[in-house]
């Protein structure tokens, strides 16, 4: 039925498969930036939290009887830590983007979305394509022009990522300035890859840019990257959260977030809050090694290296696997150019990162198709 499509994917080196990798490989492919996924004491803490309750399953939607004290505690902790009026748990970052875009785009609203926004957001715009306008990646001038051309009486949402998941670029402060000077405009910030990697206390894009006023900001924070768990949370003014609670299909018509994941997120969050300065210092040491060895600045939790074609990219990935390192090989159509995506993780030692950097340096000397992205 799909044989020709699959053959075509094989032909252009875009075929993908699930794979169980050798556990002895050093992991530089995942989004476990702070290395929390291997801390068994935190897993035990999460289990102990859950054991104290009679029920260990969410059972139903949050709007039936699936809302649990652990859910409420996590929402309160995040709202307090990130200084938002209210918070709402969702099942994943994908479901969070779906909730925001499907629900907030009421009849008189427009969405202006960065062209490099996460695939879950771009997919969600297909529900209401006539209300969506894309602007060039991190291009303030292009956004301003499109806002100028839009009807003045419309409610406007601007969707960006704090740190873009495929190129590691950080969204500029200018986006905040735009919503401050534009009537009826709100900023949606997907902080999946910025929370835990940037900011004075690793709290993400808003802290990085020292943004305090959040009455026109909607933040989507996921738990599956730096917090090494699963799920996500929307943080926003109370009225926005109430509206999402009452209208978002991916909140109303789905089972509440797993209680084990919620407990694990709480355990990891508590550790993060207590150790954030030490975690930041350790992450900066790994970043410094990459800069000193490869000349690549890494202000976030990962960096990318561009390749001319898919075979060259896969050859580089194989070369590194033979050296004992697992890195991400990101191919079109996910990205326009093949990218080696190298994630830093505190579960790896500084010596591991030094060895990886040297392996990349060795590869670059023998492969002309390699260049830093």
Swiss-Prot record:
InterPro entries: Aminotrans_II_pyridoxalP_BS, Aminotransferase_I/II_large, AON_synthase_class-II, PyrdxlP-dep_Trfase, PyrdxlP-dep_Trfase_major, PyrdxlP-dep_Trfase_small. Pyridoxal 5'-phosphate binds at residues 93-94, 165, 190-193, 222-225. Pathway: Cofactor biosynthesis; biotin biosynthesis. Substrate binds at residues 16, 118, 334. It catalyses: 6-carboxyhexanoyl-[ACP] + L-alanine + H(+) = (8S)-8-amino-7-oxononanoate + holo-[ACP] + CO2. GO terms for molecular function: 8-amino-7-oxononanoate synthase activity; pyridoxal phosphate binding. The keyword Transferase applies. The modification N6-(pyridoxal phosphate)lysine is found at residue 225. It is an enzyme of class 2 (transferase). Its cofactor is pyridoxal 5'-phosphate. The keyword RNA-binding does not apply. GO terms for biological process: biotin biosynthetic process. SUPFAM superfamilies: PLP-dependent transferases. It comes from the Bacteria. Keywords: Acyltransferase, Biotin biosynthesis, Pyridoxal phosphate, Transferase. Its EC number is 2.3.1.47. Homodimer. Catalyzes the decarboxylative condensation of pimeloyl-[acyl-carrier protein] and L-alanine to produce 8-amino-7-oxononanoate (AON), [acyl-carrier protein], and carbon dioxide. Belongs to the class-II pyridoxal-phosphate-dependent aminotransferase family. BioF subfamily. This is 8-amino-7-oxononanoate synthase.
